[in-house]
UniProtKB/Swiss-Prot annotation:
InterPro entries: IspD (IPR001228), IspD/TarI (IPR034683), IspD/TarI_cytidylyltransf_bact (IPR050088), ISPD_synthase_CS (IPR018294), Nucleotide-diphossugar_trans (IPR029044)
EC numbers for this chain: 2.7.7.60
Keywords linked to the UniProt accession: Isoprene biosynthesis, Nucleotidyltransferase, Transferase
Main function: Catalyzes the formation of 4-diphosphocytidyl-2-C-methyl-D-erythritol from CTP and 2-C-methyl-D-erythritol 4-phosphate (MEP).
Record GO terms (molecular function): 2-C-methyl-D-erythritol 4-phosphate cytidylyltransferase activity
GO biological process, one term: isopentenyl diphosphate biosynthetic process, methylerythritol 4-phosphate pathway
Originating organism: Bacillus cereus (strain ATCC 10987 / NRS 248)
Nucleotidyltransferase as UniProt keyword: yes
NCBIfam families, sorted: ispD
Name of the top EC class for this enzyme: transferase
Name by which UniProt lists this protein: 2-C-methyl-D-erythritol 4-phosphate cytidylyltransferase
SUPFAM superfamilies: Nucleotide-diphospho-sugar transferases
Reactions the enzyme catalyzes: 2-C-methyl-D-erythritol 4-phosphate + CTP + H(+) = 4-CDP-2-C-methyl-D-erythritol + diphosphate
Listed pathway(s): Isoprenoid biosynthesis; isopentenyl diphosphate biosynthesis via DXP pathway; isopentenyl diphosphate from 1-deoxy-D-xylulose 5-phosphate: step 2/6
Length: 226
């Protein structure tokens, strides 16, 4: 069993919507509801902890009334950074050995990816899902190409990311003591010298970040319904 942690206190400035992007609609249903539905079907998911902006609590609670989720959902105070929100959420876990940390704006994660991440976390203590980078990657400095990066070993990392509670807590405490801000939770685990297992993600598992992503998400949902 695991607890799902969703850091949901971000402002989503790149979306330019003037509100939390998780409230935006895909096929007339909020993004966050699509995401929660992906996990409520998973028997291994014990409960869900969402780290939110307290000012948005009424909106989240209203969503839960309108779109009930078949898992216990707890709202806690988010932090200034995503990393702070996850750390706060870890403090509220109980009676589980593992947590999965997932972006609320990734509504198309499959049960297979979820299970693969959990299995790898049980094996290694920490795990991520990722897909091969398809585009050519270049290092650029001051508007000029410095080098073309060999992409054969490069992966685009997604969520969920899975961890044993004790390991993730250790990694976050170490980062906090050193004022280190990572780009994801796995980077904190890497920083303390621990292994992170990697499983195959999905190109459908997009993060809805920009207006263009919303259009793509609508198309994905249309394909799924077919």
């Amino acid at each position: 069993m695991y607890t799902l942690i969703i850091p949901a206190a971000g402002q989503g400035k790149r979306m330019g919507a003037g509100k939390n992007k998780l409230f935006l609609l895909i096929n007339e249903v909020p993004i966050i509801v699509h995401t929660l539905r992906a996990f409520e079907k998973d028997k291994a998911c014990k409960n869900i902890i969402m780290a939110i902006n307290e000012e948005e609590r009424p909106y989240f609670e209203e969503l839960m009334q309108k779109y009930p989720v078949k898992k216990p959902v707890q709202f806690i105070q988010g932090g200034a950074e995503r990393q702070d929100s996850v750390y706060n959420a870890i403090q509220h876990t109980s009676d589980v050995e593992y947590v999965l940390v997932h972006d609320g704006a990734r509504p198309f994660v499959t049960n297979k990816v979820i299970q693969d991440v959990l299995t790898a976390a049980e094996k290694y203590g920490a795990s991520i899902c990722a897909v091969p980078v398809k585009d050519t990657v270049k290092k650029v400095e001051q508007g000029v190409v410095v080098e073309t990066v060999e992409r054969s070993q490069l992966k685009a990392v997604q969520t969920p990311q899975g961890f044993s509670v004790s390991l993730l807590l250790e990694a976050h405490r170490s980062a906090k003591q050193s004022c280190f801000l990572g780009t994801d939770d796995a980077s904190l685990v890497e920083r303390i010298g621990k292994q992170v297992g990697v499983v195959e993600g999905s190109y459908y598992n997009i993060k809805v970040t920009t207006p263009e992503d919303l259009l793509i998400a609508e198309s994905f949902l249309h394909v799924q319904k077919k």
